[in-house]
Amino acid sequence: MGMFDYKSYSSEESVELFTTAYRLATYANIAGIAGLPTESMVQSISDAVLNSGLYPNVVNAGLPDGWRELTPTDLSLPASAVDSWGQYIIASPITGEMLSGPQAKILGEYDAQGNLTRVAVSFTGTNSPVDIVDYFQLNTGELAPNMAPLLTAVRDFVLKNGLGADDVIVTGYSLGGGMANLMAEYRESLVGGFFADANYVGCASPLICDAPGVVLNYGYENDVVYRIVGDEATWQDAIAAGDPGLVNPDNRYDSTRDNIVLFDDMYASPLWSLTPFSIANIPVAWYAHIDGVFSDATLRIANNPFYEFMARDSTTIVANLSALTRGITWVQDKQTVTSDHYGTTAFIIGSQYDDLLQGGVAGDYLYGGAGNDTIKTGAGADRVDGGAGKDNLRLEGSQSDWDVYRLSDGTLFFNAHNGTGLKQAEGVEQISFENEWLSWTRPYDVTASGLEDNRSLISWFDQDVAYRKATEGTTGNDVLSVKAVFGQDGNDVLTALSSGSLLHGGEGNDALKGGSGNDALYGAEGNDVLYASAGYDQLYGGVGDDVFRLGASANNTHIMDFNQANGDHDRLLFAHTVFGSTAALGAAAHQVANDVVIAQGNFHLTVHDALLQEVLYSSAIIVG
């Protein structure tokens, strides 16, 4: 599983294809504007001003290694096929071949021996006012037939070099992304259907071809251009389907990635919530659209250590703050008018600099990346990787509010006494606590034997924290029954003691069984089965399609993360000894504020932060 999975390619192949296509798309967007070497100019300005730390990443405006522009001679076309801006001309049905109308770059990838390996059609985004008139015919498709002359030459070049349509990438950014989606829509008829099996990647596209097996569409939730006209039949229909004031309706499609936030300076500012998310609000609503051309957020998503747990629509927050705001702004899944995913599991990804990252109310994944980061956990079962640098993990309360465990590989677990979720941490060197302000500047050091207190100038007053004892599983399939156990990898079977246990399955498809005491069950990553029993039990399925088994002894069970991650399909299976029919189950279920409570006799279940209809839809009664 991966956010950028596409067609039948492996996850690694999909990532390479997508990130390459994105680079090609942004290159075409900035290259040769007004006939100037603007791609080189952008790189020079970035190197002189931005790349020293002002911008959140090193801007790379050039082509990926091995790629070059293909000339008219390469494609057996006359020199007039390219305009004075160095772009291939596509005639507009309205403006004809007017300079800076519809354009494209045709690019080739060559191996070390000089052999052509792939070809790309990268449609150009808006680079002059001439393009504006073509916005109004994207949905109706009048432009599609005019692509045929150039695409015919591309087809012939591909075949002449022994390649096929599956060796072709079709991409573009902004308007260029819209043209890539338009070509995808007409792939069966253009040039005899040759490009039906090409690889289509739309970047920040206003138009959406909603065919997930054909096109991968990527953009940012806080980019007003992305999905603005959707897949409506005409631009008039798109306006009618949108919100008043030309506000982006934030529609979802099967081919789009829908919950990614580029957390930039504008998104962090008060202006974000005070002004409309309208296509007409260029200074505010277009900020991420422009930022997306230069950001390396796509690479940071793909390279983060939690990528394998991400689904197509996982809530993803990517730090993209400048040096002006980076040191004073917490990057988080914030509650705002442009978001409908607040409270879901979020993947929060830092930059190469010193970031402030903060978890929310769900079980989040936080990755610092390079730099000396401060990472603050939230209310759920969070997982943290500090990355490179000297990173500080900040926890709620005081050190006395936590039990701390350390595994043989250095992984830390922090179990909160107040039941706000287990925190897993890797790659962090320091620990601080919200209620111990001295620890903010003099944090505890993580050592092999415990947390070393540095708050006092006199070591006699130190309150070092020793690690608690726990049983650690192997990378295989373990069967364990102890007080505190961390299963690690493998498909484990973990059983609680009668006195109560802390069970953590780790990665893999695990079975966790509660006992007669008060238990905390954490399935973590994988498709897990969690069995509730007597006592006060807290069940966290984690990322994956988890099953919660509920028998008659479950007298005080709390499911803490039901379908919390986008893409999860959790289920509740009730024993027939509890409810004899779905009608009886429905009669016992009630919405109580944000939770669902199911109670009958001694049986009592609370599904936190859930809707009654969703819980009942995901429930079944079983025998055995």
Report the location of each language-model feature:
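Short glycine-enriched nucleophile-adjacent loop
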Residues: 181-188
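Low-complexity acidic/polar repeat-biased segments
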Residues: 418-469, 585-624
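Acidic, glycine-rich calcium-binding repeat modules characteristic of RTX/beta-roll
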Residues: 354-433, 444-446, 477, 481-584
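Short His-Asn-centered micro-motif
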Residues: 122-124, 171-173, 201-205, 377-378, ...
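Generic recognition of long tandem-repeat/solenoid scaffolds
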Residues: 107-109, 121, 404, 409-418, ...
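Alpha/beta hydrolase fold serine-hydrolase catalytic domain that processes acyl esters and thioesters
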Residues: 2-167, 188-370, 443, 448-461
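Gly/Ala-rich beta-loop-alpha elbow adjacent to hydrolase catalytic centers
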Residues: 172-176, 180
